[in-house]
Design a protein with these regions (language model features):
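C-terminal alpha-helical interaction appendages
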Residues: 1-70
Length: 70
């Protein structure tokens, strides 16, 4: 995995955490837990899925769908 791919994954993760804090009023710790324990995060780190190339809004939508199912 290239440094650029790792950086994109990190940025996407940071964006998701920030969006959860801003939109759902979660604490930073709760938002981080939600992201890091999600199926989306596992897929985001898998370079084969290419999810790290998607926009933050799209990823947030996927995370919201995942949370709604649980």
């Amino acid at each position: 995995m290239s440094d650029k791919q790792k950086q994109l994954m990190e940025y996407a993760t940071q964006d998701l955490v920030a969006m959860l804090v801003e939109r759902q009023g979660l604490t930073l710790e709760d938002a981080m837990q939600r992201v890091y324990h999600s199926q989306l995060y596992t897929k985001l780190l898998d370079q084969e899925t290419g999810l790290y190339l998607e926009g933050s809004e799209y990823l947030y939508g996927l995370l919201a769908e995942e949370s709604a199912v649980v």
